[in-house]
């Protein structure tokens, strides 16, 4: 049980995919202008990352390794992610049309989110078993969502703040992301993975 807790805390805070591994920066910068959009994208990404991690582990363990097709791992994982994203898009469209319109083009772009593929590949490279793979995917997604929601809240505050003209827009957003990364670096001694 302690191992799972350490894996969760380590993945969410210490080895955050956005601020430490620099994966998933496109949606991090693109969808984080409004808190509501960031929360919706975070939920969709959490669902996709968790399900894609589980499916990728199953396909790797039951199909690719037994058939000695591990050289197709990346291609297979991309296909798995595309299927999971299409499934997620259908679910979001049916359950929350407002969120579907709000996310717009960013929902299909989860397919190209390198953090989702990174989680699937890192699960295999780190030698996680099924439960660890599911928890690692969920933890990475929680960390991604946490950072995106925090960043969106800060960006909403910055939109009404008196920021000097040269720093308005993306410049202050990048500075803020750097400061957030430094803040998360404070967790680096918390857990050793």
Curated annotation (Swiss-Prot):
Keyword set, alphabetical order: Cell inner membrane, Cell membrane, Electron transport, Membrane, Translocase, Transmembrane, Transmembrane helix, Transport
Entry's family note: Belongs to the NqrDE/RnfAE family.
Chain coiled-coil ranges: none
Cell compartments where the protein resides: Cell inner membrane
Pfam family, one: Rnf-Nqr
Protein name: Ion-translocating oxidoreductase complex subunit A
Transmembrane regions: 5-25, 47-67, 72-92, 102-122, 134-154, 171-191
Subunit structure as annotated in this protein's UniProt entry: The complex is composed of six subunits: RsxA, RsxB, RsxC, RsxD, RsxE and RsxG.
HAMAP family: RsxA_RnfA
Xref: PANTHER family: INTEGRAL MEMBRANE PROTEIN OF SOXR-REDUCING COMPLEX, ION-TRANSLOCATING OXIDOREDUCTASE COMPLEX SUBUNIT A
EC number: 7.-.-.-
Protein's job: Part of a membrane-bound complex that couples electron transfer with translocation of ions across the membrane. Required to maintain the reduced state of SoxR.
A GO BP entry: electron transport chain
One CC-aspect GO term: plasma membrane
Native source species: Salmonella typhimurium (strain LT2 / SGSC1412 / ATCC 700720)
Topology term for the membrane: Multi-pass membrane protein
């Amino acid at each position: 049980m302690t191992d799972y807790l350490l894996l969760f805390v380590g993945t969410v805070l210490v080895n955050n995919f956005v601020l430490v591994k620099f994966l998933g920066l496109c949606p991090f910068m693109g969808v984080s202008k409004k808190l509501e959009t960031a929360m919706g994208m975070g939920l969709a990404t959490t669902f996709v990352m968790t399900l894609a991690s589980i499916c990728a582990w199953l396909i790797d363990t039951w199909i690719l390794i037994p058939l000695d097709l591990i050289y197709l791992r990346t291609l297979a994982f991309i296909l798995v992610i595309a299927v999971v994203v299409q499934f997620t898009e259908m679910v979001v469209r049916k359950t929350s049309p407002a969120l579907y319109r709000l996310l717009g083009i960013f929902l299909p772009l989860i397919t190209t989110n390198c953090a989702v593929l990174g989680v699937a590949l890192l699960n295999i490279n780190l030698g996680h078993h099924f439960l660890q793979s599911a928890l690692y995917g969920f933890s990475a997604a929680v960390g991604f969502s946490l950072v995106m929601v925090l960043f969106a809240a800060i960006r909403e505050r910055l939109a009404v703040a008196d920021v000097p003209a040269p720093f308005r827009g993306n410049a202050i957003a990048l500075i803020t992301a750097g400061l957030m990364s430094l803040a998360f670096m404070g967790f680096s001694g918390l857990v050793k993975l």
